[in-house]
């Protein structure tokens, strides 16, 4: 099966304090109307981070600051295998303008399940929620380290693992 390598920008209002995530509804093709994180194919000679910046410039006419890798999603569609590097991003300059998507929404943690995500993108939602759940409550951990910890333990009740005095 053919593998297609892509990137996705999980654009948040602030990488340091995530309260909203930007999502778009695909404006073309088989999955038209399905919700996704903006991004696209990695071109030859490009790093995944460079691809994120280029794709957001092409699709949304803005420049993003690329943060940490959230995860690499491996997903089998009927016709191809998708390998998608997903990065935290925030707008560095410009305003997000829809050049390819048919709609967009800023979603809070509570609203992330309110849209119909594309199959590969939906697999990332629990990890995003885990990182958003504890923002602002961390006092003794570096936010990046804690977010990484939350992602690794997203299938467990994190508050039972970490001493109560941290929250």
PLM regions: where:
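Conserved Nudix-box catalytic region and its N-terminal flanking loop in Nudix hydrolases
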Residues: 18-58
């Amino acid at each position: 099966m053919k593998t297609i390598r892509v990137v996705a920008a999980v654009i948040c209002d602030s990488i340091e304090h995530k309260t909203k995530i930007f999502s778009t509804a695909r404006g073309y093709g088989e999955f038209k109307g399905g919700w996704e994180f903006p991004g696209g194919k990695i071109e030859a000679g490009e790093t995944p981070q460079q691809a994120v910046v280029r794709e957001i410039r092409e699709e949304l006419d803005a420049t993003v600051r690329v943060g940490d890798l959230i995860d690499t999603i491996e997903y089998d569609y009927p016709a191809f295998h998708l390998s998608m590097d997903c990065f935290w991003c925030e707008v560095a300059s410009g305003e997000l303008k829809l050049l390819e998507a048919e709609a967009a929404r800023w979603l809070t943690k509570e609203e992330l399940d309110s849209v119909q995500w594309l199959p590969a993108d939906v697999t990332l939602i629990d990890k995003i929620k885990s990182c958003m759940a504890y923002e602002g409550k961390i006092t003794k951990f570096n936010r990046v380290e804690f977010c990484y910890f939350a992602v690794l333990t997203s299938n467990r009740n994190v508050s039972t693992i970490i001493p109560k005095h941290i929250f």
